[in-house]
């Protein structure tokens, strides 16, 4: 994020943030977004392209971009990087088969220049499912402790029950606002 972007955001009376939600297909990105927004989650289908939701939370205006995670769509992810304040990486904790794919895709995002400085929240989703990897196990598999380029946090959650979605989002907002916004 450039200096002009930071200065512009400091002057804004309305605290507006751009959050980019990415992850492999079927990780639960759209379900998290809908649950957070209080919408029905019974009829969710794979995202072919992207969804944008604008939500108000804790005095912030959040523009959340939920981008499809199918392999055929991942090359388009870079089209959404510009002006991103926070990156939400969603992991299907029950999908042990694709953890290496998940790790590889996350690592490729972290070297993107246009995401430099963006705060990273990793949602270890589907904690309600039997056999789901714990947050600590995912932390190891994804090699999160090696991340030095971004502030990050991993939060175990369930998009279906809504458990731990708010603490994750609140951490993200606290971290972003401590970097971007000045005290009033």
From Swiss-Prot:
GO terms for biological process: bicellular tight junction assembly; centrosome cycle; maintenance of protein location in nucleus; negative regulation of GTPase activity; positive regulation of cell-substrate adhesion; positive regulation of microtubule polymerization; protein folding; regulation of aerobic respiration. Not N-myristoylated. Gene3D superfamilies: P-loop containing nucleotide triphosphate hydrolases (3.40.50.300). A lipid is attached at residue 2 (N-myristoyl glycine). GTP binds at residues 23-30, 66-70, 125-128. The modification Phosphoserine is found at residue 45. GO terms for cellular component: centrosome; ciliary basal body; cytoplasm; cytosol; lateral plasma membrane; microtubule cytoskeleton; mitochondrial intermembrane space; mitochondrial matrix. Changing residue 80 to A: Reduces interaction with ARL2BP. Keywords: Cataract, Cell cycle, Cytoplasm, Cytoskeleton, Disease variant, GTP-binding, Isopeptide bond, Lipoprotein, Mitochondrion, Myristate, Nucleotide-binding, Nucleus, Phosphoprotein, Ubl conjugation. InterPro entries: Arl2, ARL2/3, P-loop_NTPase, Small_GTP-bd, Small_GTPase_ARF/SAR. Changing residue 76 to A: Does not reduce interaction with ARL2BP. Changing residue 30 to N: Does not inhibit the interaction with TBCD and rescues the TBCD-induced microtubule destruction. Reduces interaction with ARL2BP. Inhibits accumulation of STAT3 in the nucleus. There is a cross-link at residue 71 (Glycyl lysine isopeptide (Lys-Gly) (interchain with G-Cter in ubiquitin)). Changing residue 15 to L: In MRCS1; decreased interaction with UNC119; decreased interaction with ARL2BP; changed cellular respiration; decreased ATP production. It is found in: Mitochondrion intermembrane space; Cytoplasm, Cytoskeleton, Microtubule organizing center, Centrosome; Nucleus; Cytoplasm. Changing residue 7 to D: Reduces interaction with ARL2BP. Belongs to the small GTPase superfamily. Arf family. NCBIfam families: small_GTP (TIGR00231). Small GTP-binding protein which cycles between an inactive GDP-bound and an active GTP-bound form, and the rate of cycling is regulated by guanine nucleotide exchange factors (GEF) and GTPase-activating proteins (GAP). GTP-binding protein that does not act as an allosteric activator of the cholera toxin catalytic subunit. Regulates formation of new microtubules and centrosome integrity. Prevents the TBCD-induced microtubule destruction. Participates in association with TBCD, in the disassembly of the apical junction complexes. This is ADP-ribosylation factor-like protein 2.
């Amino acid at each position: 994020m450039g200096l002009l972007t930071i200065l512009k955001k400091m002057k804004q009376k309305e605290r507006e943030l751009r959050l980019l939600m990415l992850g492999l297909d079927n990780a639960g990105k759209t379900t998290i977004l809908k649950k957070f927004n209080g919408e029905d989650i019974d009829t969710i289908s794979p995202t072919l392209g992207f969804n944008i939701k604008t939500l108000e939370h804790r005095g912030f205006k959040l523009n959340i971009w939920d981008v499809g995670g199918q392999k055929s769509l991942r090359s388009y992810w870079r089209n959404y990087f510009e002006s991103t304040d926070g990156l939400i990486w969603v992991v299907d904790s029950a999908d042990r088969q694709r953890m290496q794919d998940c790790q590889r895709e996350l690592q490729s995002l972290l070297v993107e220049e246009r995401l430099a400085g963006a705060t990273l929240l990793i949602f270890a989703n589907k904690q309600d499912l039997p056999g789901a990897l714990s947050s600590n196990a995912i932390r190891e598999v994804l090699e999160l402790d090696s991340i030095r380029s971004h502030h990050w946090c991993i939060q175990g959650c369930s998009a279906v029950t809504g458990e731990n979605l708010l603490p994750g989002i609140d951490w993200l907002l606290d971290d972003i606002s401590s970097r971007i916004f000045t005290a009033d």
